[in-house]
């Protein structure tokens, strides 16, 4: 029993060290824990504050400010489903949604109809 507790404690320490390394390197899930608040002159958060602030320039550009159709309140939404390596389709076009580019969709339609 004591050996199992020691093994578990060692495993948790290793995970903690790995998490600290990812945060220091700015990789992995570290960007989720970093947020910058924009404030007005009364030091209150403004609507310009996105839900999360990323340290990664690749991810930062894909936050889009949208407006609610019902109450017209503005909110931020992440507009990409892909990492830096997978963002481009085989035709070299950037994709921010799950939809394919026109060439990819046309090719897929031809393959399914054949």
UniProtKB/Swiss-Prot annotation:
Predominant location category: host cell
GO biological process: viral DNA genome replication
Cellular component GO terms, alphabetical: viral replication complex
Swiss-Prot/TrEMBL keywords: Host nucleus
Compartments it resides in: Host nucleus
Physiological role: Plays a role in viral DNA replication.
Protein name: Non-structural protein NS2
